[in-house]
Amino acid sequence: MGSYKIAVLPGDGVGPEVVAESVKVLLALEKPFPKLRLLLSDHAVGAKCYQDTGTDLPDETLEACKTTDAVLFGSAGDPNIRFADGTEIAPQLTLRFVLDLYAGIRPIKRYPGVSPLLAADPPIDYVIMRENTEGLYASRGAGVRVGDEVAIDSMVITRKGTERIVRYAFELADQRDGAPRDGKKRVTCVDKANILKSQAFFREIYNS
């Protein structure tokens, strides 16, 4: 099965606690899979790192993320520690752009034996996929503010960015089982195409 390097970035807030438990789960995989070796290395990132060193994403951390097989990222940011322009520390956005992590994939599934949040207890199994590098994210660091009256961020939607996230969504849907209720495989486009030209462009590409 081989060895895999994982850069571990605990970060701020609940990050260290959540990552510590996640590491336990990952390392537990080595027992049932004796040929698997996970080589974990910890790296600094986040608001506390920025406060201590002047950077929220040290070069050493970035290089580690570029050369590993995976990155285990906790959380980053502190409302009391901000950049000079008032925005919060968000090294995860830098990683998105540098590593071109364009697909935000968030699976939602209800497992048997887990107390349901809904009284009806319906079967739940779907994935939310979001484009991670375009839209308003493309305006990060480039917005305009005029005194205390106006602030502007531009939304950017490109054909390349849209085509690849749409393609990824359909490929993922094809790999998964269908919806729990009827077994059908679906991809639903959620946008504001009825109002925004950029979103209408996104929908046009999706429909093509």
PLM regions: where:
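N-terminal glycine-rich phosphate/adenylate-binding segment common to multiple enzyme folds
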Residues: Y50-M155
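Glycine-rich beta-alpha junction loops
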Residues: A44-G46, N132-T133, D191-I195
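Extreme N-terminal starter segment of soluble prokaryotic enzymes
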Residues: G2-I6
